[in-house]
């Protein structure tokens, strides 16, 4: 972690751990993931007609809404480099609002090579699957967002909020073993399932 004023502010928002449990380590998003920019309508043939995930497909509970995906013609050569893979994290890099900062992140769990993602988003793709689980990283970033840390990572121009990528990609990530990650993910999802059951019964 780079110790500067920005990092200190982020540490206050997401929690600064002076000593991690045995077996944990700390790295950053940019070391863990490739970051890939999105695309939009193509200008040079050949084209391919594909569905493109947009900010509008992000639900309030940070899931992917497939009901209104927009299909457009994109350049085939660009799509070959920017199609979604199962386990990708789609990050809103432009958009947001005063009440909802930019930086919302959803986990793509669909078929690989079918959809792409818009130029208002980007993808985090884990470099080494034996390092971190995509679901663990998804819940990790979600927790950071819910704590309000993304407000320190955005600029605003004419009502549009933009993610400061260098700051976002410098987020420290605390990583346990894969087995511990799986235990944490299972526990989180068990709690969410219980909450859903309670809400449905009201």
Feature map (PLM): residue ranges:
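Extended, domain-scale alpha-helical bundle/helix-rich regions
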Residues: 1-7
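Short amphipathic alpha-helical coupling segments at ligand-binding clamshell hinges
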Residues: 133-140, 180, 187
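Ligand-binding loop in jelly-roll beta-barrel domains
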Residues: 125-133
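Sequence-specific dsDNA recognition surfaces
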Residues: 12-13, 30-42, 56-89, 96-99
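Non-catalytic DNA-recognition/assembly elements of restriction-modification systems
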Residues: 8-39, 170, 174-186, 190-202
């Amino acid at each position: 972690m780079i110790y500067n004023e920005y990092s200190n502010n982020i540490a206050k928002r997401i929690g600064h751990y002076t000593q991690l449990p045995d077996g944990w380590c700390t790295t950053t998003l940019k070391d863990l993931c490739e970051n890939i920019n999105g695309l939009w309508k193509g200008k040079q043939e050949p084209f391919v007609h594909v569905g493109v995930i947009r900010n509008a497909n992000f639900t309030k509970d940070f899931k992917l809404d497939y009901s209104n995906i927009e299909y457009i013609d994109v350049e085939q050569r660009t799509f070959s480099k920017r199609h979604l893979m199962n386990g990708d994290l789609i990050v809103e890099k432009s958009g947001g609002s005063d009440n909802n900062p930019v930086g919302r992140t959803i986990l793509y769990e669909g078929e690989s090579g079918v959809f792409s993602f818009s130029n208002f988003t980007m993808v985090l793709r884990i470099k080494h699957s034996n390092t971190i689980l995509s679901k663990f990283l998804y819940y990790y970033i979600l927790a950071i967002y819910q704590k309000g840390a993304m407000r320190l990572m955005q600029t605003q121009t004419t009502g549009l909020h933009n993610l400061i990528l260098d700051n976002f990609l410098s987020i420290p990530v605390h990583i346990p073993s894969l087995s511990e990650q799986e235990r944490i993910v299972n526990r989180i999802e068990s709690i969410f399932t219980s909450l859903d059951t309670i809400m449905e019964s009201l």
